[in-house]
Swiss-Prot record:
Protein name, per record: Cytochrome c-type protein NrfB
Subcellular location field: Periplasm
Post-translational modification: Binds 5 heme groups per subunit.
Keyword annotations from UniProtKB, A to Z: Electron transport, Heme, Iron, Metal-binding, Periplasm, Signal, Transport
Length: 188
């Protein structure tokens, strides 16, 4: 055993001597640079959703298609608003947020919108936001995926007509549920 240990020690010493004779030296490490790198997504995060929900593969339309999510500073994706689907989603399980559906309470639906659209800004933009925020789903009046939100193109007269139509239904139907107003119902 001592012969083996002697040979091993001699080998280590010989290799150290060989390196020193060949001029191998250590060089200082390069200074850390101030370069900043930006993380880019390698795949479309909406690809799985678009397989079934947008067969034309145009992707998300309208204002939400080109904005940055203020919460994570990344482009808005399907899951930002609709949530993460379960593995059973492709089999038809309704496990993501479907706006303007009675199965979700107004507060649940609107809390998704309010995570980016601050109530103070909405209140300044148009006073009915303040009045209806807890009673009517945002999707009752606003389209989510068209090229242009219908409410943005309506004249004041058109907006008043929507108010009158909805409030007329409310007066004539005691079971009226403002969360299920089908003005601009989104199709899956």
């Amino acid at each position: 055993m001592s012969v083996l240990r002697s040979l091993l020690t001699a080998g280590v010493l010989a290799s150290g001597l060989l390196w020193s004779l060949n001029g191998i030296t250590a060089t200082p490490a390069a200074q850390a640079s101030d370069d900043r790198y930006e993380v880019t997504q390698q795949r479309n995060p909406d690809a799985a959703c678009l397989d079934c929900h947008k067969p034309d593969t145009e992707g998300m339309h309208g204002k939400h298609a080109s904005v940055i999510n203020p919460n994570n500073k990344l482009p808005v994706t399907c899951t930002n608003c609709h949530g993460q689907p379960s593995p059973q989603h492709r089999e038809g399980v309704k496990d993501v947020m479907r706006f303007n559906e009675p199965m979700y309470k107004v507060g649940e639906q609107n809390s998704v919108c309010m995570s980016c659209h601050l109530p103070e800004q909405l209140q300044k933009a148009f006073w009915p936001h303040d009045v209806h925020v807890t009673k009517v789903a945002c999707a009752s009046c606003h389209s989510l995926h068209p090229q242009q939100d219908t409410m943005q193109t309506l004249s004041d007269k058109g907006r008043i007509k929507i108010c009158v139509d909805c409030h007329s239904d409310q007066r004539t139907n005691p079971n009226f549920n403002p969360a299920s107003v089908p003005l601009l119902k989104e199709q899956p």
